[in-house]
């Protein structure tokens, strides 16, 4: 038995480089001619890049519940109807029309398909939309060199209601019986500088205690509607009161950016092994001896926002001096990527708060 990991040439940095050593894990390129037979003959398949979506849909038969679920989650309009969230308003808009938007309430403007927080903007009636449109154009030009149109749409945008509340992410799968198995829960605090939106995700005892029962209940109810088995997903929620409101459910980026591998470097739990073995980690046992103040952090070291990466380079040691306990360090070619590395850390609450104030411009220095 194996877990097949479907990757593409546009797979995000960090996803593969941080994978746990696991003999029963096999990486398959989405252009592999065997792809159709792999899907027909194997149950344990995880897709790790949104840019594979067209190939995956073409490979799966129309009647396949997995295909139906992927299409459903891809279309944010149908998805909202499915979860009966009529209060949540969402509509499409072309990039060129952004400056004409009439905004009454706080809203989120973002590309229809997006990645890495690119061009995600919180707007309200006071936003200077012409100025914002120019900023977005600049950001899209910069990031579209790394992502293709399958992953980052340049012209199609959506405007949706802004949901107040803390943000959480969950990596999970439905096992062979369709039961939800949660392999990690993260709090996603918003950093001081929103251009580094995905800088920090962390797990903690309190996060699990608060979110786990709500998530379990949500996923059980969801599968009464989508009826999938052996189906891994990455999900994002806002917590309002004691209700989880889904922001995104994405079966195309399980473990994307390497976030799903944090659980391995924190608790020695290999999410792919649990997927293969159809089981969930015993979280109450895992957290039994964990200090309440301990934060297991996935840290994305972004490139500087306003310094040219052709004339500046990251001072990695300066950044590392900010950390308490590094469990994993994985560096990238910052000239080709939007970040220069990812780190798995163990921090306390106080230092975590300090890390959220980071401006990566301060960690880039002139190439002499």
Model segments located where?
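ATP-binding N-terminal substructure of ATP-dependent carboxylate-amine bond-forming enzymes
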Residues: 1-70, 347, 354-368
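A conserved helix-loop-beta module that forms one wall/lid of the active-site cleft
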Residues: 62-147
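Conserved ATP-binding module of the ATP-grasp superfamily
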Residues: 90, 126-164, 200, 221, ...
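A short catalytic or substrate-binding loop motif that flags glycine-/basic-rich loops and adjacent residues
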Residues: 113-114, 162-166, 227-231, 334-335
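Phosphate-binding site of ATP-dependent enzymes
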Residues: 137-190, 234, 238-245
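ATP-dependent carboxylate/phosphate-activation module, predominantly the ATP-grasp catalytic core
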Residues: 161-164, 171-227, 250-279
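Conserved metal-phosphate-binding beta-hairpin within the catalytic cores
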Residues: 172, 223-258, 287-309
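Peripheral (often C-terminal) accessory segments that flank ATP-dependent C-N-forming ligase machineries
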Residues: 276-368
């Amino acid at each position: 038995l194996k877990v097949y990991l479907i990757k593409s040439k546009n797979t995000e940095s960090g996803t593969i480089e941080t994978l746990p050593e696991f003999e029963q894990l096999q990486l398959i390129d989405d252009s592999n001619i065997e792809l159709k037979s792999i899907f027909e003959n194997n149950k344990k398949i995880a897709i790790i890049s949104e840019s594979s979506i067209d190939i995956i849909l073409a490979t799966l038969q129309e009647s396949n519940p997995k295909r139906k679920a992927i299409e459903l989650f891809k279309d944010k309009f149908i998805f909202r109807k499915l979860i009966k969230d009529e209060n949540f308003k969402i509509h499409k808009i072309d990039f060129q029309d952004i400056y004409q938007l009439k905004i009454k309430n706080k809203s989120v403007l973002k590309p229809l398909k997006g990645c890495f927080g690119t061009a995600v903007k919180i707007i309200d009636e006071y936003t200077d939309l012409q100025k914002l449109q120019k900023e977005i154009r600049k950001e899209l030009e910069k990031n579209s060199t790394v992502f293709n149109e399958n992953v980052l749409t340049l012209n199609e945008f959506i405007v949706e209601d802004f949901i107040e509340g803390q943000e959480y992410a969950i990596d999970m799968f439905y096992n062979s019986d369709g039961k939800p198995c949660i392999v990690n829960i993260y709090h996603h605090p918003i950093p001081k500088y929103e251009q580094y939106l995905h800088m920090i995700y962390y797990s903690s005892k309190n996060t699990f205690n608060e979110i786990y029962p709500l998530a379990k209940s949500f996923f059980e109810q969801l599968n009464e509607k989508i009826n999938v088995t052996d189906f891994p997903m990455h999900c994002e929620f806002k917590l309002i009161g004691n209700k989880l409101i889904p922001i995104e459910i994405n079966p195309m980026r399980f473990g994307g950016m390497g976030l799903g591998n944090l659980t391995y470097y924190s608790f020695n739990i290999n999410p792919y092994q649990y997927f293969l073995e159809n089981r969930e980690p015993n979280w109450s046992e895992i957290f039994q001896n964990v200090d309440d103040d301990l934060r297991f952090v996935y840290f994305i070291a972004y490139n500087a926002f306003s310094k040219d990466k052709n004339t500046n380079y990251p001072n990695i040691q300066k950044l590392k001096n900010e950390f308490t306990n590094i469990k994993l360090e994985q560096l990238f070619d910052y000239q080709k990527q939007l970040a220069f590395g990812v780190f798995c850390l163990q921090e306390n609450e106080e230092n975590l708060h300090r890390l959220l104030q980071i401006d990566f411009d301060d960690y880039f220095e002139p190439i002499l």
